[in-house]
Structure formats: C-alpha cells, structure tokens
Amino acid sequence: SAASDVYKRQLYACQSDPVTQKKSRRRLWGCTALLLLAALLSGSIPAPGMQNCFYVILPFLGELIAAVSVVWAVVKLGRDWSAVREYVYERTVPALPGRALCAAVFAAAGILCELLYLALSGHGGQLFSALLFVMLKVLSLICALTIRRKLKCLNWAKVPKCENQ
C-alpha cells in the first residue's frame, strides 16, 4: 500500500537556497571527478619512484583508496539534497570532510615522497613524468581540500516530521 511506502525515519535537507545548492553540488561533483581522475592518472604514468619505491607507491595507494571512498559517498549522497534519508546522511555528509582530508594528506605525502625520491635518486631521464606526477598530486590536493571546505560550509538540518510524512 502507499502508506507503507512512506519513509518513517528522519530526513535531512541542505539549508542553502536552491541556486547555492546547485552551485555547491556542481562543484562537489566536479572536484570529486577531478580528484579520482588525477589519482588514477598519477598511477598510470611512468614517474620515477612509482615502479620500484615503496615510499612513493604507498601514498599513491592511500590516495586512490581515499578518492574512491569520496566518490562512493558523493554518489550515495546523490543530487537531491532537499530530502536525504537519515542513513544516507549519516554515512555521507559527516564522513566526507574526513575522507577528503585523508585524500589530501595522501596527495601531499605523495608530493613529498616523490620529491624525496628525486632528491635521492634523480629523475633518470624522466623529468617530464616526474613533473606531471607532482602536478597531478597538486591537483588532487586542491580538489580534496576544496571538497572538504565546501562540505564544511554547507548547513544541513533535520526535516520536521510533519513535512516528512
């Protein structure tokens, strides 16, 4: 019956006006896509250290896992922020800033570790790959910090029960 299809638990809604909400959603989705793309691309170029150096590879793996986690949460949050179910809200909105920070920390570690590798071992004729790798890590870092900042600025509130039914 239609009555049993009504969601009984709490709903949450973003309190921004529709124009701000749309802009925030676009920026969130765009930064999330760029974060994942930059992480994937940085792992697919032959940068010095990425073939045989654990302290360059490990931050990349951490960043990739964190980026996938951010993507999962953003997709789960969806595009309609006017009525987000409680279990979706709890697994996405409060968790996303931490996940984005995790991706940012691993991207920053990737930059530092690649620079350390270059200082200790040189670029081995792959200067372009090394520079591209570092630039992709910088892009990941910027995207992750932007995601974190945007989500922390959004105000979410419970939808009153009378509107929920």
Model-inferred region functions:
Residues 83-100:
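Short membrane-interface loop/juxtamembrane segments of multi-pass integral membrane proteins
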Residues 2-6:
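Short, small-residue-biased leader/transition segments that mark boundaries at the very start
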